[in-house]
């Protein structure tokens, strides 16, 4: 039996309004619990369009057929008009998710975090995280115990800033296994649960065809030597590719693969490490990546 952490990122208004209810229904039918990370502030994701001038981002958008994958409402959100606030407008959906799944913070403003947080000072970053946590806690009526940095944009500054909130764990980076990042003080910080597997948009049209993706991914899962964690997006697997996700769950069950919330992957003893800036094939720009203590 292979146990895989299932992380669901919710980046946009439509992903919350349309994708999350569909995913909740699918997961219920398959008796699966997951960790769902919500963006709760303004939906300004359309402002990423300026990145089309970067060849790597343009190629990603073309090979993944982004217009049909996400829809023009997502691709243009927050450009010609102010971005709609996601959280309180979809409070009932978020509360329903929290009844059955582990719920954490993805971002206050996903676009702002991904595009500008690397230039923020620590207090600005703390204030932004606090705003998102406060909003999510108001919605679900209970403390939030986990978070996942938007776009995996995390480095030592993010790790230090999140220590102020005493969360149970964060999932801010890519890597191989859960670990505790070393702080500037030399002490171990809040546990990190890295994503280990590629996302749909990172590999479609580059490493694998859409129709072959599920078999390709299951092969990666079964060969994973660490602690496998897979991320889906409400805007993708909850919308245009929900049928592919259902097929993945059915095939996974046949292969003895089970899915669980990320918190179930934690153990009392974790290795030490750091979150450093790195690159992942198929994704434009830098991401937080796990570095085991003592390695270079």
UniProtKB/Swiss-Prot annotation:
<comment type="pathway">
    <text>Glycolipid biosynthesis; 4-amino-4-deoxy-alpha-L-arabinose undecaprenyl phosphate biosynthesis; 4-amino-4-deoxy-alpha-L-arabinose undecaprenyl phosphate from UDP-4-deoxy-4-formamido-beta-L-arabinose and undecaprenyl phosphate: step 2/2.</text>
</comment>
<dbReference type="Pfam" id="PF01522">
    <property type="entry name" value="Polysacc_deac_1"/>
</dbReference>
<keyword id="KW-0378">Hydrolase</keyword>
<keyword id="KW-0443">Lipid metabolism</keyword>
<dbReference type="InterPro" id="IPR023557">
    <property type="entry name" value="ArnD"/>
</dbReference>
<comment type="function">
    <text>Catalyzes the deformylation of 4-deoxy-4-formamido-L-arabinose-phosphoundecaprenol to 4-amino-4-deoxy-L-arabinose-phosphoundecaprenol. The modified arabinose is attached to lipid A and is required for resistance to polymyxin and cationic antimicrobial peptides.</text>
</comment>
<comment type="similarity">
    <text>Belongs to the polysaccharide deacetylase family. ArnD deformylase subfamily.</text>
</comment>
<protein>
    <recommendedName>
        <fullName>Probable 4-deoxy-4-formamido-L-arabinose-phosphoundecaprenol deformylase ArnD</fullName>
        <ecNumber>3.5.1.n3</ecNumber>
    </recommendedName>
</protein>
<dbReference type="GO" id="GO:0046677">
    <property type="term" value="P:response to antibiotic"/>
</dbReference>
<dbReference type="GO" id="GO:0016020">
    <property type="term" value="C:membrane"/>
</dbReference>
<keyword id="KW-0441">Lipid A biosynthesis</keyword>
<dbReference type="GO" id="GO:0036108">
    <property type="term" value="P:4-amino-4-deoxy-alpha-L-arabinopyranosyl undecaprenyl phosphate biosynthetic process"/>
</dbReference>
<dbReference type="InterPro" id="IPR002509">
    <property type="entry name" value="NODB_dom"/>
</dbReference>
<dbReference type="GO" id="GO:0009245">
    <property type="term" value="P:lipid A biosynthetic process"/>
</dbReference>
<dbReference type="InterPro" id="IPR011330">
    <property type="entry name" value="Glyco_hydro/deAcase_b/a-brl"/>
</dbReference>
<keyword id="KW-0444">Lipid biosynthesis</keyword>
<keyword id="KW-0448">Lipopolysaccharide biosynthesis</keyword>
<comment type="pathway">
    <text>Bacterial outer membrane biogenesis; lipopolysaccharide biosynthesis.</text>
</comment>
<dbReference type="GO" id="GO:0009103">
    <property type="term" value="P:lipopolysaccharide biosynthetic process"/>
</dbReference>
<dbReference type="InterPro" id="IPR050248">
    <property type="entry name" value="Polysacc_deacetylase_ArnD"/>
</dbReference>
<keyword id="KW-0046">Antibiotic resistance</keyword>
<dbReference type="GO" id="GO:0016811">
    <property type="term" value="F:hydrolase activity, acting on carbon-nitrogen (but not peptide) bonds, in linear amides"/>
</dbReference>
<feature type="domain" description="NodB homology">
    <location>
        <begin position="2"/>
        <end position="260"/>
    </location>
</feature>
């Amino acid at each position: 039996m292979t146990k895989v952490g299932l992380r669901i990122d919710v980046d946009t208004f439509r992903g919350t309004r349309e994708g999350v209810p569909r995913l909740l229904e699918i997961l219920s039918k398959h008796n699966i619990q997951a960790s769902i990370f919500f963006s709760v502030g303004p939906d300004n994701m359309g402002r990423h369009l300026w990145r089309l001038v970067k060849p790597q981002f343009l190629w990603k958008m073309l090979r993944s057929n982004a217009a049909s994958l996400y829809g023009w409402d997502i691709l243009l959100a927050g450009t010609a008009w102010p971005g709609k606030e996601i959280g309180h407008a979809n409070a009932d959906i978020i509360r329903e998710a929290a009844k059955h799944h582990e719920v954490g913070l993805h971002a206050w403003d996903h676009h702002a975090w991904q595009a500008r947080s690397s230039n923020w000072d620590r207090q600005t970053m703390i204030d932004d995280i606090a705003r998102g946590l406060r909003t999510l806690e108001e919605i679900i009526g209970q403390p939030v115990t986990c978070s996942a940095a938007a776009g995996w944009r995390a480095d030592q500054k993010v790790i230090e800033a999140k220590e102020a909130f005493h969360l149970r764990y964060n999932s801010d980076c890519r890597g191989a296994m859960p670990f505790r990042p070393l702080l500037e003080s030399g002490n171990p910080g809040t546990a990190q649960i890295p994503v280990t597997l590629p996302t749909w948009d990172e590999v479609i049209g580059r490493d694998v065809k859409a129709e072959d993706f599920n078999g390709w991914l299951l092969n990666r899962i079964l060969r994973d030597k660490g602690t496998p964690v897979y991320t889906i997006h409400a805007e993708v697997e909850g919308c245009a590719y929900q049928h592919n996700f259902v097929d993945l769950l059915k095939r996974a069950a046949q292969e003895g693969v089970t899915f669980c919330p990320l918190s179930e992957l934690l153990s009392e003893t974790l290795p030490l490490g750091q979150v450093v800036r790195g690159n992942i094939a198929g994704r434009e720009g830098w991401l937080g990546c796990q570095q085991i203590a003592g390695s270079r």
